[in-house]
Amino acid sequence: MRVVADTNIYISAIVFGGSCEAILALARAHVIELYLSSAMQGELRSVLGQTFGWSPSRVKEALAEITRLASLVRPNVRLSGIVANDADHRILECALAARADFLVTGDKRHLLPLKTFRGVQIVSPRAFLDLLR
């Protein structure tokens, strides 16, 4: 099963644990295949470093762990006008490039209301875990 986890899922998994960490555990156990893009890596670097005040070495360590779990894809389309937040376009681009079955996100304002996008099911972490039970 091909999955793109929104950057908010990685942040929540790393900082808070819970259901988002359970999604990363599924990738560690090879139950799901995770994908991310360089734009998503940049957003993760920025949020962990600037928003959470992590040191560069701690950010590098977290990104290394994520990179071990997720395959890097290079989106070949540039989306706009679908959602209000441009960073969310980068997430959708990654999902398309990965040919993802699911996009897992906590974004209730922009992404979850879409429900599906070009064949990609967009679900919350809890809904995704429930689907796998």
Residue ranges of model-derived segments:
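Amphipathic coiled-coil/heptad-repeat helices and related helical stalk/stem segments
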Residues: S19-C20, V59, A87-D88
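PIN-domain endoribonuclease scaffold, especially VapC-family toxins
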Residues: L26-R78
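Short, well-structured N-terminal submotif of metal-dependent ribonuclease cores
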Residues: M1-L36
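Short, flexible loop segments at the rims of nucleotide/cofactor-binding pockets, characterized by
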Residues: I11-A13, R78-A84
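Short, hydrophobic alpha-helical packing/hinge segments within bilobed ligand-binding/sensory domains
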Residues: I23, I91-L92
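Acidic, PIN/NYN-like endoribonuclease modules and their adjacent C-terminal/linker elements
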Residues: I82, H89, L96, D101, ...
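Short secondary-structure boundary segments
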Residues: S38, G106-K108
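Short, flexible helix/strand-to-coil boundary loops that buttress conserved ligand/catalytic motifs
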Residues: I14-V15, A27, L48, K115, ...
